[in-house]
Amino acid sequence: MPRHNKKDSTSGASQRQLRVAETVRHAIADILAQGHVHDPVLEGHLITVPEVRMSADLKLATIYVMPLGGRDTTDVIDALDHNRKFLRGEIARRVNLKFAPDIRFRADERFDEAERIEKLLRTPAVQRDLAPDSDES
């Protein structure tokens, strides 16, 4: 009977990936909150880090960020990309891994998606479908 060592793509991240991702998330959130990055764009924004995803080999961290208020997202992502080398070094000092993960930043769009769904649920057509029928008795 053949054994399959590769993970099924639907099974999600391993416990180690999740643990390392959470450690990296805390480290990058602390770095940004304490103002260690001297960049005028970043100094003018409070940045939340809701999620970090690690690659299977733990060599790539995709960091999802959102400026508080959701404004200037592209400017913030560009500033973080510009300071990527410094941030990677800070993460390496704070997280005990064999290799410092390469990092990339992405905008967290879950808030926008939740708002879109909320608006959709408030449309008259959906409200009509959700209303209890008064004809049923």
UniProtKB/Swiss-Prot annotation:
GO terms for cellular component: cytosol. Keywords: Cytoplasm, Ribosome biogenesis. GO terms for molecular function: ribosomal small subunit binding. It comes from the Bacteria. Gene3D superfamilies: 3.30.300.20. Belongs to the RbfA family. This is Ribosome-binding factor A.
